[in-house]
């Protein structure tokens, strides 16, 4: 997750999922849990779908026809689905717990893209169900007090905060005459045409 909008959480979650999916024998699923303002399909070039997390939870956790499989790298995606009226209630439901339990039997790693922590209750609900949480922070934009507020909120929700991911950082490599950026907005993501138990709530 991130503290507020525009930090780069979704592209971070997508890049993390793609990178992990390239590891041999590691089955990865990316769950788009930002049912209010999803951007995962944009980064992965997925078409709008009428099914996804919102419809799965409305069907009591039944995933038939909702998972999307990418070939290269071999990544499975559960899109957010149609905009839900009460996302927090769905994420806190028994159906969500059942869904995560099912995914853990099929995948080695579950990466969840959650909404901003200070915007809605959803991230706190997801954090309590995840094995670990990454907080995405945008360099040069996010204020220190905002990050601390997000950290404190996650701690109150008993989240296992693994650390922070700093985005939009420029650095200079000795011997080269140009700057490179982490998580460029036009990154390789756009070129991207489980038995396990790890669940990571990542963050855009």
Give each language-model segment a name:
Residues 1-204:
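P-loop NTP-binding module
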